[in-house]
From Swiss-Prot:
This is N-(5'-phosphoribosyl)anthranilate isomerase. One of its GO terms (molecular function) is phosphoribosylanthranilate isomerase activity. It holds the Pfam family PRAI. Its EC number is 5.3.1.24. Belongs to the TrpF family. NCBIfam families: PRK01222.2-1. It comes from Geobacillus thermodenitrificans (strain NG80-2). One of its GO terms (biological process) is L-tryptophan biosynthetic process.
Amino acid sequence: MAMVRLKYCGNRSADDVQVALASGADYLGFIFTESKRNVSPEEVKHWLALASLGDKQLVGVFVNASVDQIASVTEQLPLHVVQCHGHETPAELAVVKEATRLSVWKAIHHDDGALETMKQYAGVADGYVVDSRVAGAWGGTGVSFDWEAVPRYLEEAARQGVPCFIAGGITPDNIERLLAYRPDGIDISSGIETDGRKDPAKMKQIEEKTKQYLAVGKGAK
């Protein structure tokens, strides 16, 4: 049974970072765009200096940012992945990859045309995050999409040879339903928060349910 990778996104304080670093997450995400979870490279650099990164990887999330803006952040922080969460084109992703020499993931917002959109990034995107489409917001909404569509996204990502994370409205209460579809990764922000702060108890619930699922090895067809 393949592992399910966990990404805890939207870390926005020293406490959030310490909690996430102590967790079982594989990736820590930071939002470098207009958002209630927006952070600056300077803040993140300071928080990371207070603790050991260990084997966790860092993801920087950007929305329609210029390559210069992205490169400015990657030069200041030891990011492993750049996540483009807006309307960036395949050509723009290629430029970001060339400039940063990092893995670049593309967010795909679920709708009837999303699968065709995903196919356009084949050979360019190093991974995908499929998120809910919510008017006026790019992500971190706490809203999930119809997970019956998940297998189609996973199949396309597998065809391209890259991982596919699922995001949007995932909580300790519903993660088992999502795990049944065998996603490559799960991207959580609001679902691991209490009163706007990362909650280690919710993280532990997420991790325990994921481990239980992997141990049993069950999944939807």
